[in-house]
Design a protein with these regions (language model features):
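C-terminal structural segment of proteins
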Residues: 1-169
């Protein structure tokens, strides 16, 4: 039996996470598991609010984990990620899929994670700890808390190139 718990804050939700728990934000990955009766989890935790702000300062770009691909496309400060966000799903998926959730997407769905890795991004967890994207991706299968943001160092959009390569059907 699947149970769902709604928490007031992201920090509270982080404390509720366990081995058989999945966090629900956009739902594009978790709901697939629900629909196909994935036996690896029996509990869903969600928070009433998720950080969605996309903010640039002199040192780089901070993207809240709850920001959707559509939010990225609408943010002038996130221009460097526009080509990537445009390639993720169709409009319905881009309106739901979150930056934080895409970090957990298995091949071939984790397009954003690839670009963030190339841009030397860092992942911020609930509680404030950060780690390099490479370290995060290497251990993402181990439960370690909730992602709250992705932080990119300052980069020039005209110097970054990204291409999606996939098999044709």
């Amino acid at each position: 039996m699947l149970s769902v718990q709604t928490c007031a804050t992201l920090d509270e939700a982080a404390r509720q996470m366990g081995d058989r728990t999945r966090f629900l934000a956009g739902g594009t990955l978790v709901m697939r598991g629900v629909n196909y009766a994935d036996p690896s989890f029996d509990r869903i935790v969600r928070a009433r609010t998720m950080p969605r702000e996309i903010r640039s300062d002199g040192t780089g770009l901070r993207i809240g984990a709850g920001a959707t691909m559509a939010d990225l496309l609408a943010a002038r400060d996130a221009e460097i990620l526009h080509p990537v966000a445009r390639m993720i799903g169709g409009p319905a998926v881009r309106n739901m899929a979150t930056v934080g959730g895409n970090l957990f997407a298995a091949h071939p769905y984790g397009d954003l994670a690839t670009a963030l890795l190339a841009l030397d991004a860092r992942v911020e967890m609930a509680g404030g700890a950060t780690e390099p994207m490479e370290t995060f991706l290497a251990g993402r299968d181990r439960q370690r808390g909730l992602v709250t943001a992705v932080i990119l160092p300052r980069a020039n959009a005209s110097e970054f190139r990204w291409a999606k390569i996939s098999r044709g059907k």
